[in-house]
Amino acid sequence: MTKIITRFAPSPTGMLHVGNIRAALLNWLYAKKHNGQFILRFDDTDLERSKQEYKDAIEEDLKFLNLNWDQTFNQLSRLSRYDEIKNLLLDKKRLYACYETPEELELKRKFQLSKGLPPIYDRASLNLTEEQTQKYIEQGRKPHYRFLVNHEPISWHDMIKGEVKYDGKALSEPIVIRADGSMTYMLCSVIDDIDYDITHIIRGEDHVSNTAIQIQMFEALNTTPPTFGHLSLIINKDEKISKRVGGFEITTLRKEIGLEAMAIASFFSLLGSSAQILPYKSMEKLANQFEISSFSKSPTIYQPEDLERLNHKLLISLDFDEVKNHLKEIDAEYIDENFWLSVRPNLQKLRDVKDWWEICHKTPNVKSLNLDKEYLKQAAEVLPQGKITKDSWSIWTKEITNITGKKGKELFLPLRLALTGRESGPEIASVLPLIDREEIIKRLTSA
């Protein structure tokens, strides 16, 4: 049986966002489920926009999500191989020279659109005479090269979309070699997939027309194309997720928002499938349940609040042994098991545990708030006797209402401020048992 090899091929021209991390996750999971390999390739032929800092950030995000790769390489290291295949395809008459300037191509595109026609290249360069070609050369124009698409049916069985069919005549022939001699993604990707024995490619459905063209490239190189799967696009408020849209970058989710790696991995691995989105604790367990056939053809709606809810579900499922190393990573190694189990149900982000610790162990300085000292003194006098429990808050506030007549915000806000120094935060009912009874009275009477 052929060994399954998948790949993830980001361009280091920006940060990873939720759309392409989903492709990375699914390629990794598919490979691991079938005891295959996962390759990380950097499509860095865009010299102007590719940056080392983006490459480093992409690797950091993948490592954070435990998407370890078996091999990695970048396209710039393979230029001599691309030249070899370029010459082969030129000999086969599957590449042809074009001399239009970017401005001329844009005028053609606008004219076609104004007539209600699809912006497909008109193959004008195929009909150039030697005299016309020589004239362009004398003008100093350098040719770019397009791949010649055969005008015939193209079809494949897609892992997600099922049977997909294209008419070669409906496809615009892509530029594969720029005027400066550098090569674009389209052909380089095919050469890499052949040389690295890629068997399966899972990517966004915005690549479907590229796949149709690349299938002809594989065939032109006498190679059977890999098996393709095209994911429906993720949308948020009726907008496609773009690489350049802020707020959906993985770095933002993990660093600024503070979400757990397995919450992010679980959510985006299952989003758009028929499987229930659950917080898995390991990539191995996630891979075991993974089924590419469960993914829908319809657009997938991404609601950030759903991801944050899943993060909460993951946190409340973690035992102390499962989280103590993570606590060290956020400099909260002082948290013990008893404290973790007490505050765990109220955590939205792991870093919230540090806020809880500070609330419970540091007497806040609230002198400047000018709180009602008489009211707080009355509240201290009716604090339930004995050990403070989760039920103490409701018992206490009922008694406070009986003696003061206060209710709602008028009742609880002064108590929250005196006890925590904050207007918002964890439920006071949950905070009380973590503070000594004597400390509660001290905070109320010294405010």
Curated annotation (Swiss-Prot):
Q: Which InterPro entries match?
A: aa-tRNA-synth_I_cd-bd (IPR045462), aa-tRNA-synth_I_codon-bd_sub2 (IPR020751), aa-tRNA-synth_I_CS (IPR001412), aa_tRNA-synth_I_cd-bd_sf (IPR008925), Glu-tRNA-ligase_bac/mito (IPR004527), Glu/Gln-tRNA-synth (IPR000924), Glu/Gln-tRNA-synth_Ib_cat-dom (IPR020058), GluQ/Sye (IPR049940)
Q: Which UniProt keywords apply?
A: Aminoacyl-tRNA synthetase, ATP-binding, Cytoplasm, Ligase, Nucleotide-binding, Protein biosynthesis
Which residue numbers does the motif 'HIGH' region cover? 10-20
Which Gene3D superfamilies does the entry mention?
1.10.10.350, HUPs
Query: Which Gene Ontology terms of cellular component type are present?
Result: cytoplasm
Q: Which Pfam families match?
A: Anticodon_2 (PF19269), tRNA-synt_1c (PF00749)
Entry coiled-coil feature ranges: none
Catalytic function, reaction form: tRNA(Glu) + L-glutamate + ATP = L-glutamyl-tRNA(Glu) + AMP + diphosphate
Q: What class of enzyme is it?
A: ligase
Quaternary structure (record): Monomer.
What family is it from? Belongs to the class-I aminoacyl-tRNA synthetase family. Glutamate--tRNA ligase type 1 subfamily.
| The protein, known as | Glutamate--tRNA ligase 1
Which organism is the protein's source?
Rickettsia felis (strain ATCC VR-1525 / URRWXCal2) (Rickettsia azadi)
Organism lineage reads as: Bacteria, Pseudomonadati, Pseudomonadota, Alphaproteobacteria, Rickettsiales
